[in-house]
A protein has these predicted regions:
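Short pre-active-site segment immediately N-terminal to redox-active cysteine/selenocysteine motifs
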Residues: 60-62, 66-70, 136
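Hydrophobic alpha-helical transmembrane segments of integral membrane proteins
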Residues: 3-4, 76, 134
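A short beta-strand-turn-helix
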Residues: 41-62
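A generic structural signal for alpha->beta connector loops
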Residues: 40, 91-92, 117-118
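N-terminal targeting signals for export/organelle localization
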Residues: 1-44, 174
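Structural microenvironment flanking redox-active thiols in thiol-disulfide oxidoreductases
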Residues: 75-114, 124-131
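Thiol/disulfide oxidoreductase modules built on the thioredoxin-like
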Residues: 111-116, 123-174
Length: 174
């Protein structure tokens, strides 16, 4: 009898741990890059086709948002990003990192939904995203004026998350 009960008990304990991890809504995975400089890169601007490097980000606090047209979460957060980019009380550039996407679809998407980005960099092979430790889109990074990563959010960004998680860090940086 004990031989039959013990596997059931172990099974239910494991299922409990699984259920807890599935319903844990913490989308801030620890990143080994927090407190470190942004990775070096040279990428082409999606709109102007100019080349940009990580050095250009240094000098002001900014957000880097990893997105793609095929990403459902990116569409969910996009309206908030447009609002954020137009907020005169919050002067923070949003740099878009278009990840593994089709250039024409990405340009069309921005034309139709609005372009919240001060610069839109394209990462067609995803190499720069890998250097940032990106798991999937959307992901957003808060970068200080020295190019140091202070915060990483995985998933769609909205006002609640921005005010709860990013604004306090911004306050410390200012």
């Amino acid at each position: 009898m004990t031989r039959r009960i013990l596997p059931l008990v172990i099974f239910f304990v494991l299922m409990g741990f699984l259920a807890q991890s599935l319903f844990d809504s913490d989308s801030e995975l620890p990143s080994p890059l927090i407190g470190k400089s942004i990775p070096q890169f040279t990428l082409q601007n999606l709109i102007t086709e100019e080349m940009h490097s990580n050095e250009e980000i240094i000098g002001e606090i900014s957000l880097i948002n990893v997105w793609a047209t095929w990403c459902v979460g990116c569409e969910i957060e996009h309206e908030f990003l447009v609002e954020l980019s137009q907020d005169e009380n919050l002067d923070i550039p949003i740099i878009g990192l278009n990840w593994k996407d089709d250039d024409q679809l990405a340009k069309l998407w921005l034309n139709q939904l609005g372009d919240p980005y001060s610069i839109v960099l394209k990462d067609p092979e995803g190499k720069t995203a890998i250097d940032f430790g990106v798991y999937g889109a959307p992901e957003t990074f808060l970068i200080d004026s020295n190019g140091i990563i202070h915060f990483k959010h995985i998933g769609p960004l909205d006002r609640e998350i921005f005010e709860r998680d990013i604004l306090p860090v911004l306050g410390e940086l200012n």
